[in-house]
Amino acid sequence: MLDKIIRIATRQSPLALWQAHYVQHLLQANHPGLQVELVPMVTRGDIILDTPLAKVGGKGLFVKELELALLEGRADIAVHSMKDVPIAFPEGLGLVTICERDDPRDAFVSINYAHLDELPAGSIVGTSSLRRQCQLRERRPDLIIRDLRGNVGTRLAKLDKGEYHAIILAVAGLKRLGLETRIRYAMPAEESLPAVGQGAVGIECRLDDNFTRQLLAPLNHRETELRVCAERAMNTRLEGGCQVPIGSYAELDGDTLWLRALVGAPDGSEIIRGERRGPAENAEQMGVELADELLSRGAREILAEVYQDNPPL
């Protein structure tokens, strides 16, 4: 059966193509002789670039077209950045593999300033993420936070043209594109709690495709799977998408999982934080329990207001 060609559905951005080539390499390293080809496509999130992500709305903004290719048999697997993967999947599809996680932190990128704390009052900082925006505004209410869309290269070009004094990007994305020299510093989780699944690559396929699932099995990284499971369980309970002010980050120390999370008002006026420690085998339960705690402490009201202020187009 190794004469079968495995087709990877992927977005066309440089970062998405890097991730698809990465999975292609892993598959061929684990299964010598296997033919793997890429099927690049454009998603709705790639097309609508003149509107803030929160207002574009809709869960699965960057994955629906890829999932349609799976359902129609035009591709065998879809490779996603885990922070873009919705909490629910179309019938017949599922997330079957999570590859080893890269650095999940946010990156502070600036030409003239080495640290967020060095930015003068009134400096303009670019990010499209409500999660990043609320944490920035809490820490530095004197800054001007402006939306920033486009792929990594486009965002860096806007910084270089002087439209922003600093921008916030993902460390993993910059490293994968060979742009780590642009990182002034990686922001610790205490300063900017990462997004759910940030830094991890996930693989989706048809659940009845046992041949492909067997090929993918060696690519799954158990530690990453447990960490992301806790983060996604929390996000699922909060009914969050990838365009809401929710942060969640799990670390594993031996068999003990440490899960931190936050829900914040986009203006930074209120951020509700919580954490849990427990056996890694209870990762999903911990995520649900932490979400319930945040909801009981006011997260429900914050999220309701976010959805009201940013109705999907």
From Swiss-Prot:
Xref: Pfam families: Porphobil_deam, Porphobil_deamC
PROSITE patterns: PORPHOBILINOGEN_DEAM
GO-annotated cellular components: cytoplasm
Cofactor note: Binds 1 dipyrromethane group covalently.
CDD domains found in the cross-reference section: PBP2_EcHMBS_like (cd13646)
Modified residues (S-(dipyrrolylmethanemethyl)cysteine): 242
Enzyme class, broadest EC rank: transferase
Catalytic reactions of this protein: 4 porphobilinogen + H2O = hydroxymethylbilane + 4 NH4(+)
GO molecular function: hydroxymethylbilane synthase activity
Signal peptide location: none
One GO term of the biological process aspect: protoporphyrinogen IX biosynthetic process
Record EC number: 2.5.1.61
Annotated keywords: Porphyrin biosynthesis, Transferase
Pathway the protein acts in: Porphyrin-containing compound metabolism; protoporphyrin-IX biosynthesis; coproporphyrinogen-III from 5-aminolevulinate: step 2/4
InterPro entries to which the protein is assigned, alphabetical: HemC, Porphobilin_deaminase_cofac_BS, Porphobilin_deaminase_N, Porphobilinogen_deaminase_C, Porphobilinogen_deaminase_C_sf
Cofactor or coenzyme needed: dipyrromethane
Oligomer and partners: Monomer.
Protein family according to the UniProt entry: Belongs to the HMBS family.
Role, per record: Tetrapolymerization of the monopyrrole PBG into the hydroxymethylbilane pre-uroporphyrinogen in several discrete steps.
More about this protein: The porphobilinogen subunits are added to the dipyrromethane group.
The protein's name: Porphobilinogen deaminase
UniProt organism field: Yersinia enterocolitica serotype O:8 / biotype 1B (strain NCTC 13174 / 8081)
Gene expressing this chain: hemC
